[in-house]
Each structure stands twice: as C-alpha cells, then as structure tokens.
C-alpha cells in the first residue's frame, strides 16, 4: 500500500524523473536531525514501520556522545523489536528489496567524494533512467544519485555497506556480513575511547579495525592521531606518510599538521594545516588547530582572521569566540 499510493500520485503529477523507464518508490517520511545522518535514517525507517518514538529521545539513545554511534543504534533497535542486518549489497539487491518487499535501505557512503567522512543515506526508490532515489538527511528528500555516482561514494571500508532494518517477525533472504559489522563496531569503539582519552584502548580497537581494512585512509588517519597522543611520533609520522600521498583530504592534512608540529618540523606542519584549512574552512577542528598553530608562531593577525572567518559561519560558537577573545587580549 505504501508504494501503491505513491505510484498513483506520481502518475497523476507526472514528474520529470518518472517519465520513462522502470521505477519503484516507497512512501517514507523525511527527517533531518542536523549532524546526525544515521539517527535521521533510523527515525525515517521506524516511522515507515509505524513505530512511535520521541525524536530527541531517539537522538540521545543513538548518539549519546554527540555523534551517530552504530553500536548504540543496534542496541536501541533490537530492544525495540527490530532485526538489524549489517551487510554488503549490490544495487540490484537494493532494487529487489524496494520493488518486491517495499523495504527502504540505509547505505553507508561518503558525502560528496570517496573517503571524506562516513555518511548515511536512506534509499527509498529507484528510476532506471536516472538512478537511486534517496532521503538524504543533509540535502533533501527524493534526492537522486545516478548509479555511477552512487557507486563511487559507496566504497569506504568495503563496497556496498548497507543496513537493513525490519521488524523481528519479518525475515529476509539476506545474510549479515560479520566482517563489515565487526570493522564498523571496532571503529565505533575507537571513537568512544578517543572521546574519553583512553588512548591505549583506542589503539587496541583501531588495530583490530586495520587488520580487516589495512589500507583504509580513515583508519590509518585515526591510527596516526592515536599514536601521536601516545607520544609514538615516529610511527605516527610513518602512518600519516603512508596515507596522505593518495588521500590528501582535509582531515588527513590536519592530522599531518599536528604530527609535524609535534616533531617541530614547522614548515611542513604549516603547509599541511594551510591545505586542510583551504579545503575545509568550516571544519571547527581544522580551524582550531590552524589558529593555534599560527598563534604559536606569533602570526597573531592570521590566527585572528581564521577564527573571525569561522565566526561569520557560526557566530554563536562559544569555544571559537573564547579563543578569539584570548588572542585579542594577548600582548
């Protein structure tokens, strides 16, 4: 019934993207909890299945430390009576789930380009002429990605990372991929240990992750940062140099800046901080690190400019305002 009502509406309205070709679409409500793409996708799926929930309560359960946490999401869903499949699917398998079972599918991708950061989209339909129809938590509902673009963003730790959520009494002919699930949970654990500054435990978890995906740039970057915090500067340098030639992404350049700054290679550190900031001037961590680096080199005016530019975008950010006030009051 979900799909039938939508198809009738589509036929009446005749939107451009349904003009030709095979298509399917399920009627899924749209939510955008800013900064919480996984929580947003889970809320859409739950409401699709008729569950009652408080959105803020859901956010606090799935994102207890301020970011989407997969382990917390699995626990929450299983306690609510849902089965969670973490697996790898191909596009044709997603189409089959939509077309024959009317089940929306959460995919773990990058946001705009491979390996920028883990981002979750909800696939709600497809049009063979134009691509996959998604409820994108950051962009909009009914956001279409052509299949080639979709696949290019779907490479991450492993190609085809997928979360399928269904009521426990509904069984599907798909199997969970324990390798993918374990890797994602190892990384989730790593983030929690980093948050609590438990660097030895963080190192243990990220090493488990890297045994599964030894060349993953996100994992290597995190490993370099943890080694830096543990004072293992030489291995931190070797790790970041292993990943940055192929993936000079802003967050990796930022970590490289921190490593070389600690090694007192000021010239190289400045180059990497500058690259990170130029590519991502709205990233708070990059802004803080670059401003602190500039201030440490007595480039006070440049540091002020970096912080002031960020405050144009986020005028109420107290931490950045305090940093700027500290610089303004310095002699």
Model-derived regions: residue spans:
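TPR alpha-solenoid repeat register
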Residues: 219, 252-253, 286, 320
């Amino acid at each position: 019934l979900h799909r039938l009502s939508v198809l009738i509406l589509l036929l009446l309205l005749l939107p451009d993207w349904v003009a030709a070709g095979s298509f399917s679409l399920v009627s899924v409500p749209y939510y955008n909890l800013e900064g919480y793409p996984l929580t947003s996708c889970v809320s859409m799926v739950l409401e699709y299945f008729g569950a009652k929930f408080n959105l803020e309560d859901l956010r606090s359960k799935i994102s207890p430390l301020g970011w989407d946490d997969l382990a917390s999401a699995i626990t929450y869903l299983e306690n609510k009576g849902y089965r969670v499949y973490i697996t790898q699917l191909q596009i044709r398998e997603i189409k089959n789930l939509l077309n024959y079972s009317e089940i929306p599918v959460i995919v773990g991708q990058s946001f705009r380009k491979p390996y920028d950061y883990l981002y979750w989209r909800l696939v709600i339909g497809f049009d063979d002429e134009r691509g996959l129809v998604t409820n994108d938590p950051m962009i909009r509902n009914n956001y279409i990605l052509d299949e080639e673009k979709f696949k290019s963003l779907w490479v991450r730790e492993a190609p085809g990372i997928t979360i399928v959520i269904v009521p426990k009494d509904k069984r599907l002919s798909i199997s969970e991929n324990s390798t993918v699930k374990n890797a994602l949970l190892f990384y989730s654990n790593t983030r929690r240990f980093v948050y609590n500054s438990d660097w030895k435990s963080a190192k243990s978890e990220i090493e488990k992750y890297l045994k599964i995906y030894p060349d993953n740039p996100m994992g290597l970057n995190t490993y370099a940062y943890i080694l830096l915090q543990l004072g293992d500067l030489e291995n931190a340098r070797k790790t970041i140099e292993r990943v940055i030639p192929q993936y000079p992404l802003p967050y990796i350049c930022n970590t490289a800046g921190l490593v070389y700054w600690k090694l007192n290679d000021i010239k190289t550190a400045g180059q990497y901080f500058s690259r990170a900031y130029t590519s991502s001037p709205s990233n708070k961590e990059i802004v803080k690190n670059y401003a602190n680096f500039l201030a440490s080199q007595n480039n006070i005016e440049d540091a002020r400019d970096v912080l002031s530019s960020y405050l144009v975008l986020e005028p109420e950010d107290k931490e950045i305002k305090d940093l700027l006030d500290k610089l303004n009051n310095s002699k």
